[in-house]
């Protein structure tokens, strides 16, 4: 399914049911803004962030080549994990980019399909010869317990996605992780972001590292379920200040979603870095390498500005 913006929001009630009943599927979303004070058809993450609580796993890409490589990961992982996936990339900036890429063919992906999981999925199909009842009503005595019973499935997703990323890497030669680090090994100032802004950030980081600066970036691929273990392993131990860049706005919130997730990962940690949040690129407003330089300059201040 290929959708975006208000079209995705219309699916939210069904997304709860799809995830709740463990129905494997993939929604490919060219992430776009939502109509608020005015109509805007351009790109940001307001639509996908509005659906992050539905139970769909969320996989993000920052370039056309990443979309080609990781879309297959979403399809392979949803069959094996039984968790539906929302595979998203930036509307217009990535979805409309004309770029030369290396293609993955069906023959590359077919051997990676978990045939046992696929057979089990087909066996669960509704069949009048084997009638079953699913998704029925529940009362207070059972609903809570059954709602919590999904946890094991979601805890298994990061390892499954990582497994298929490794398989895709063997085919393509391009290394992918749940969180990809780019920059100096001993970085003290680090940006956390996802989507096409990571491409601009790489340009700024190349310039700064070449000039002796200790900077870097963690690009988020698997946003939901958010694996704190994998995230913390990707962040350099030398990091002193972190800027988390969100491409969405939640009026009235203490912080945007990715910022709050990152803050939670460091909660209670000894010598935790200073973490600040920032917002960028609403409605496809350009974010340039020069603006990324400004983010790193802010992180170098004794008291970096937050939000």
Give each language-model segment a name.
Residues 58-120, 284-307:
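Structural signature of the thiamine diphosphate
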Residues 11-15, 36-42, 69-72, 96-103, ...:
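Short acidic, glycine/serine/threonine-rich loops at helix termini
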Residues 241-307:
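Peripheral docking tails and interdomain loops at the edges
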Residues 185-213, 226-233:
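Redox- and metal-dependent alpha/beta enzyme cores, enriched for Fe-S-associated oxidoreductases
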Residues 85-180:
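Conformationally flexible catalytic loops at phosphate/diphosphate-handling active centers
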Residues 23-31, 109-118, 241-243:
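A glycine-rich helix N-cap at a beta->alpha junction
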Residues 1-52, 56-79:
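Thiamine diphosphate
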């Amino acid at each position: 399914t290929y959708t975006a913006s208000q079209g995705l929001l219309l699916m939210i009630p069904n997304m709860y049911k799809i995830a709740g009943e463990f129905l494997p599927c993939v929604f490919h979303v060219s992430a776009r803004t939502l109509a608020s004070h005015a109509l805007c058809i351009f790109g940001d993450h307001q639509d996908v962030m509005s659906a992050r609580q539905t139970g769909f796993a969320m996989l993000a890409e920052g370039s056309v080549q990443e979309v080609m490589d990781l879309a297959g990961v979403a399809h392979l992982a949803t069959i094996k994990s039984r968790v539906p996936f929302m595979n998203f990339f930036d509307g217009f900036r990535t979805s409309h980019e004309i770029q030369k890429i290396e293609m993955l063919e069906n023959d590359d992906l077919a051997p990676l399909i978990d045939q046992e999981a696929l057979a089990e999925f087909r066996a669960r199909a509704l069949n009048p010869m084997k009638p079953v009842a699913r998704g029925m009503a529940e009362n207070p005595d059972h609903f809570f317990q059954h709602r919590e019973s999904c946890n094991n499935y979601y805890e298994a997703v990061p390892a499954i996605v990582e497994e298929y990323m490794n398989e895709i890497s063997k085919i393509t030669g391009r290394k992918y992780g749940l969180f990809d680090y780019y920059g100096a090994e001993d970085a003290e100032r680090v940006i956390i972001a996802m989507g096409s802004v990571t491409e601009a950030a790489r340009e700024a980081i190349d310039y700064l590292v070449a000039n002796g600066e200790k900077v870097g970036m963690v690009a988020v691929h698997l946003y939901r379920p958010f694996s704190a273990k994998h995230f913390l392993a990707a962040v350099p131990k030398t990091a002193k200040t972190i800027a988390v860049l969100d491409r969405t706005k939640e009026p009235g919130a203490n912080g945007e979603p990715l910022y709050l997730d990152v803050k939670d990962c460091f909660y209670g940690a000894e010598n935790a870095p200073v973490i600040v949040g920032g917002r960028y690129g609403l409605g496809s407003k350009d974010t340039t390498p020069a603006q990324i330089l400004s983010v790193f300059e802010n992180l170098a201040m004794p008291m970096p500005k937050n939000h």
